[in-house]
Curated annotation (Swiss-Prot):
Similarity field: Belongs to the UPF0262 family.
InterPro entries: UCP032146
Protein name: UPF0262 protein Oant_0325
Domain of life, per lineage: Bacteria
Amino acid sequence: MTAAVPNARLVDVELDESIGRSTPDVEHERAVAIFDLIEENSFHPIGDDTGGPYRLKLSLMESRLIFAITREAGEDVATHILSLTPLRRVVRDYFMICESYYQAIRSATPSKIEAIDMGRRGLHNEGSQTLQNRLQGKIEVDFNTARRLFTLVCVLHWRG
């Protein structure tokens, strides 16, 4: 992270509400991810030397992920539009394993739940790394921030 940039962090994250709401499990994941992201993150739009803190609005448009970044006071900083193609497979696989996980926590043995959860975490890490790589040269984030952002990308997909 660029040490010289003051307040290189997010103070607010908003998801495009026009997509609608999802299941209670997905909405819970969204709320936890946003809370955790705001509590602890490292976020710096490349080329912005003024510094944050920043607000982020995530949305989907025509199979593209949009990162609209402003300063805390509302001044536009940058908008980055990313193709979702590199994330599609891992997001699809993550959806499938999450469905298995949500079913398992209701009736499966602890060892089966643990095995599914390990696979779920592995896919989540893979998606987080892919997202971090896609943001390279645009937005500098640490891995934990990328993990929470990947969760929100998945929530947008679940809604859309």
